[in-house]
Structures are given as C-alpha cells and as structure tokens.
Amino acid sequence: MDFTYSEEQEAVRQLAGQIFTDRVTHERLKQLEAEAGDEGPFDRALWKELADAGLLGIHLSEDVGGAGLDFVAACLVIEAAGRTAAYVPVVETMVYGAEPIARFGTDAQRKTWLAGVAAGETVLTAALAELNGEVILPGGTEPATTATAQADGSWSLTGTKACVPAALVADAILVPAQCKAADGTVTGLGVFIVDPKATGVTLTRQSTTTGRPEAIVELADVHVPTDGLLGEGVDGAGVVNAITEFATTALCILEAGACAAALELTAEYTKTRVQFEKPIATFQAVGQRAADAYVDTEAIRLTAWQAASRLASGLPAASEIAVAKFWAAEGGQRVVHAASHLHGGVGVDRDYPLHRYFLLTRQIELTLGSANESLRRLGRILADEPV
C-alpha cells in the first residue's frame, strides 16, 4: 500500500478538513443538540456546504454530478467528519447508499438517486440489521425480510429491520431481502430501493449511544416497482456483501478520525493541566498511557486505510476489513477510555467536547460486528484458505 496521497486526494483532504474544522465547533454542536427534534441533530447548513464544495459526490462519476474520484476520496471526507463528530450522514449517504447504487445500479437508478446525493438534496441509507440484533454479514445472517415477485414485475416487501441509521431523514433506504417467486420458492437475495414514505412503511425512532437516532423499519406488503430492485441481472448476494464491506470500512475510517481527535484533545489538555507545579504531560504514567493510545490510534488508522485502499483498487479485502474492524472496536474503546481517564473529571463533562468522541467510538465498536465477531470472521476466512 502507498501511504502517500495523490495531488487530487491531498486537495480533497485539505478542503474537507478546512470545511469541517471551520464549521463544526463545540458551540455549533451544542446548538444542534439543543434544537434537535425527533429526527435528531442534522447540520443541514454544513450538508449544503459540503455539496457545494463537491465533496458529497466526490467519489461519483461526472455524469451524475460527481468529481469522478474513488472510494479513497470519499474516505477522506468521512475521516474529517469523524475528527469533528459532525452531525451529517456522510457514511450513510455516501457509502451505505450511493456506493452500491453507483456500482450496481442501472443507468436510470444512478441518474435518479446519485445526482441528488451530489447536489446535497438526497439522503440515503441501508438497513443491514435484523430485529433480533443480528447483522447481515458476509457468510453470516441472511435477511429475514422477504420480497415476493408480482405478476406485473413489481415486488411486495414484508419484514422488519432495526437500527437503521439516518432512516428518519432518508429519502430512500436500501433493503436486502430474500426474493421469492409467487409460489413461495426462494430465488436468491436482492437489494431494494424503498421509499420510507411509501404505504406500508412504518418508522419507529430508536435512541442510540451518540444521540443520533436510528429507526426500526417495518415493511407490511410494501409495493416496490420493477425498477426498485437494485441493478439488473446482478448477483444479489454480491451486492449485499459489497454494501457490508464498504460500510464497515467507512465506519473504521470514521473511527480513525474520532480517535485521532480525542488523542489530540488529550495531548493539549495534559500539556496545560498543572499538578505539583508541573504539566501532567511530563509525568511518566501519563506519557505511557498516552503512548499506548497513540499506538492504538495508528493501528486503527493504518488498518482502516489498508482496507479502503484495497476496496478502491478492486482487490479482495475481506480479511483486511475484519482486521480493521477488530482494531476499530478493540483499540477504539481503549483510546477513548485513556483519553477520558487522562482528562480526569473534565473527561466526563458534557460541556467539554471529548464525550462526543467517546460515545461515537463506543457506538461504532458494536456496529456491523464487534471485535469478537470480527475475529470470528477473520478465522473463517483463514480456515477457508488453502494451506
């Protein structure tokens, strides 16, 4: 892997960093939290600015209003969002939704949905968790939701999904389902583009660790037109696998940004906090704890970017993604615990920004597979490889 950025990628990194740093302040986040309704905090002004700067469609093709760059460019935007804990659904829209439509969608689907993403007019997400808490993962849980083919070529979807991020503000939700013929015969997996305002769709708000609400999505004989099935003649299982892989990697990148920011806050605090007439950063125990957190942060960053680089290059990345998610889950919680500990009482003060990184990291830890689940996935991959 080449760890240097191209000129275009460096420009994206700098632009995204500047916008997020300038617009996402502690005071702005507190304001959004205080004004949030049932849909949760959503910085629509920032969302528009990201669109105007061309960042929301940075990884989309130029024919739909994008910049024509790759998944790495999208991850640079996501990492900047993680560093500021911004209230914008960049992971959900750019990766859960737009990435699979860009890769597998028909020309009509791409033009219908991706132009709106690039313009900041469309929010997308995907429903990857079952009601019982099981997550649709490669080689793991199959979706319980069913899609029954109708005589006119349309589909009828029935089932329930849980913990769907950004569902309350989404314009469309990608829903994996077991496809069935009219006689009930299972014909394979499919991913369907569902309008959350369609008849038969019920959204129930779910509170989360971060305060960014998710939703239970209930589907009761929801009519989905023929062109609502993502792609044409594509392998549905492959689409589901791709969504999960890209989404998991994006969360690891988001985590890398959050942990880096938490560590920077900690470094600054320990340099200015004086005890026994010395900055506590000069104490050996403090330095050792911070050094351990730095090692974890670098491991999270490097493994996440390795996974992102392989995905962007079209290379197999299942084992790299499992390793990255393990580090994001296991290492991430160590980083934010160390950061909170080294801050003392300030670390748990909600008037101080550290708590947002703590909560974001803990939520990512258990999203799309915990550390143990990631190790199990890696074990299955290694066991299947010929010696």
Regions found by a protein language model. Give the residues of each.
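Internal helix-loop-helix
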Residues: 51-111, 115-120, 164-172
